[in-house]
UniProtKB/Swiss-Prot annotation:
One of its GO terms (cellular component) is cytoplasm. It is an enzyme of class 1 (oxidoreductase). Its cofactor is Fe(2+). NCBIfam families: anthran_nbaC. It catalyses: 3-hydroxyanthranilate + O2 = (2Z,4Z)-2-amino-3-carboxymuconate 6-semialdehyde. O2 binds at residue 44. Its main location: cytoplasm. It comes from Scheffersomyces stipitis (strain ATCC 58785 / CBS 6054 / NBRC 10063 / NRRL Y-11545). Its EC number is 1.13.11.6. Pathway: Cofactor biosynthesis; NAD(+) biosynthesis; quinolinate from L-kynurenine: step 3/3. This is 3-hydroxyanthranilate 3,4-dioxygenase.
Length: 170
């Protein structure tokens, strides 16, 4: 039997408290693709690299999608009501502000696919650390990788300039 439609606005009213740091997401659907509600604010400095495309739709407020586009760091502002399809293999850091909510759709990963979280030096933009893993649970694995980075001072220290980096903006 098919499930009933979900009223997204009602779901947010009743379940907004489930959107907790550091990722602030809640998976509404899994199977073929994942549909997530993501709230703000978030506090992350990592850039996610997903081999498959990601679709962002901003339901409330605006967000800033920091990307590395052909080697250049730039910001893409996604305003309330806007949708944006991010191509696969694009390093991105979704910056969500307070009292904002978005919907993100991601394709299930092929068994050979690796997701990566990459941290760039806050001072010189060199790659400081990268964690790679086959993603099976968006709700837990990204958080685990962030916490592991945060707990490893050597991984957070830039080999080029010596700057100590953090998993949260300072």
């Amino acid at each position: 039997m098919l499930p009933e439609p979900i009223n997204i606005n009602k779901w947010i009213e009743e379940n907004g408290h489930l959107l907790q740091p550091p990722v602030n997401n809640y998976c509404l659907h899994r199977g073929g693709f994942t549909i997530m509600i993501v709230g703000g604010p978030n506090e992350r400095t990592d850039y996610h690299i997903n081999e498959t495309p990601e679709h962002f739709h901003q339901l409330k407020g605006a967000m800033c999608l920091k990307v590395v586009d052909d080697g250049e760091f730039r910001d893409i502002i996604i305003n309330e009501g806007d949708s944006f399809l991010l191509p696969g293999n694009t390093p991105h850091n979704p910056v969500r502000f307070a009292d904002t909510i978005g919907l993100v759709v991601e394709q299930d990963r092929p068994e050979t696919a690796l997701d990566r979280l990459r941290w760039y030096c806050s001072n010189c933009r060199e790659i400081v650390h990268e964690a790679a893993f086959h993603l099976t649970d968006l709700g837990t694995q990204i958080k685990e990788a962030i916490l592991a980075f945060d707990g490893d001072k050597e991984s957070r220290t830039c080999k080029k300039c010596g700057t100590l980096n953090y998993s949260k903006p300072q």
